[in-house]
Amino acid sequence: MEGGGGSGNKTTGGLAGFFGAGGAGYSHADLAGVPLTGMNPLSPYLNVDPRYLVQDTDEFILPTGANKTRGRFELAFFTIGGCCMTGAAFGAMNGLRLGLKETQNMAWSKPRNVQILNMVTRQGALWANTLGSLALLYSAFGVIIEKTRGAEDDLNTVAAGTMTGMLYKCTGGLRGAARGGLAGLTLTGLYALYNNWEHMKGSVLQQSL
């Protein structure tokens, strides 16, 4: 047995000497600093102290300078575009209804189709322009109020809605501006109430307990 082991060692040593690998052995610590040509080094995140992985607060991956929530300026584009599309769709349906009502005594022919199509396009453009203008004014007032106050809350929503209604109806005099402001205040107030309904219910339940 010992002779076999010795002959095996001699054979291994001979092969090692043949391939140029003979000599003193190297440990893993000695080879740790040897650069690997043509290979990527090991990731530095493989050996990390677990204490550095504990986070006390929530963190989000955000672009530099970005807020955790969208501001008024970011939402303005979506608001204006959505209102224009909604107005166009509603106006088209209203125009179709009016066109069919006004031409109900006419037979189905090309003049009737043209008249209905004109009514659809006219009403669609009218409502899209109206809602788009309101959304533009509302977004502009919201951005201005947010930058002025330095805060984003429901007060900005209500104030922007009130000012939008007043400015949109200011051509009707003080009474028209007052009516427009009241309409904007009512709509935005209901919207703010809807957004905070769950929070208000939770507060009431906590007070009752």
Swiss-Prot record:
Belongs to the Tim17/Tim22/Tim23 family. The chain crosses the membrane at residues 73-93, 125-145, 172-194. It is a multi-pass membrane protein. It holds the Pfam family Tim17. The keyword Transport applies. The keyword Cell membrane does not apply. This is Mitochondrial import inner membrane translocase subunit Tim23. It is found in: Mitochondrion inner membrane. Keywords: Membrane, Mitochondrion, Mitochondrion inner membrane, Protein transport, Translocation, Transmembrane, Transmembrane helix, Transport. One of its GO terms (cellular component) is TIM23 mitochondrial import inner membrane translocase complex. GO terms for molecular function: protein transmembrane transporter activity. NCBIfam families: 3a0801s02tim23. GO terms for biological process: protein import into mitochondrial matrix; type 2 mitophagy. Component of the TIM23 complex at least composed of TIMM23, TIMM17 (TIMM17A or TIMM17B) and TIMM50; within this complex, directly interacts with TIMM50. The complex interacts with the TIMM44 component of the PAM complex and with DNAJC15. Upon mitochondrial depolarization, interacts with PINK1; the interaction is required for PINK1 accumulation at the outer mitochondrial membrane, kinase activation by autophosphorylation and PRKN recruitement to mitochondria. The gene is TIMM23. Essential component of the TIM23 complex, a complex that mediates the translocation of transit peptide-containing proteins across the mitochondrial inner membrane. Has a role in the activation of stress-induced mitophagy by protecting PINK1 from OMA1-mediated degradation and facilitating its accumulation at the outer mitochondrial membrane in response to depolarization.
